[in-house]
Amino acid sequence: MILVFIGPPGSGKGTQASLLSEKFSIISVGKVLRTVMESNTAEADVVKKFIKSGKLVPSNITNKIVVNALKNIEQCKSIILDGYPRDIFQADFLQENLQMDFKVLFFDIDDAVVLRRLRGRISCTDCGTIYNKLYCMPKINGVCDICNSSSFQNRVDDDESIIKLRLESYKKETLPLLEFYKAQNKLTLIDANQSTENILKKIKKMSGIY
């Protein structure tokens, strides 16, 4: 099974994916794109330009990332695809290249909550694990839970002006996917304004794996 997580930045997709990682392989397109942005490849400058402007990275880049990631995961594995597809073109591409059944979870959240959450978001410089100053800090203050690094940073795309551009881009490009997947009876709406615990319970119940 594949669970596709779709929602605006700051809606909690990555947090839920991390909490479910014991039973799911995680493909976080945003995380992979940030890795590409820091590399010495021809695509790095292109990705950096789009992320810093708050726009969607071109589909020819994200599609290739997703296909390569899916090839590297065992066929028997359950998968969470976090942050993809982001428009109708990518949704069509995904269905053409996906050999497994999938469900789409749409994280619905108020813009004001998104802005508040993203202002407090930080990530580990070494492994990329995301934390939040408001509700999800490392268990030991200043030490990453995953790799024990003490180096943290604010993400370049979490600047407030960029956040607002990302939300505008999301509403224009990604929201139409609601009707696309509703028509296929694949869509489940998640109230992402709720607590992390309540959202996790709902996802576990509907996945049928727990």
From Swiss-Prot:
Major location category of this protein: cytoplasm
Residues that, per the record, bind ATP: G10, S11, G12, K13, G14, T15, R121, I130, Y131, Q194
Binding site for AMP: R34, K55, L56, V57, G83, Y84, P85, R86, Q90, R155, R166
Catalytic activity: AMP + ATP = 2 ADP
Binding annotation for Zn(2+): C124, C127, C144, C147
Gene Ontology CC entries for this record: cytoplasm
Cellular localisation: Cytoplasm
UniProt domain comment: Consists of three domains, a large central CORE domain and two small peripheral domains, NMPbind and LID, which undergo movements during catalysis. The LID domain closes over the site of phosphoryl transfer upon ATP binding. Assembling and dissambling the active center during each catalytic cycle provides an effective means to prevent ATP hydrolysis. Some bacteria have evolved a zinc-coordinating structure that stabilizes the LID domain.
Family stated for the protein in its record: Belongs to the adenylate kinase family.
Protein known as: Adenylate kinase
Gene that specifies this protein: adk
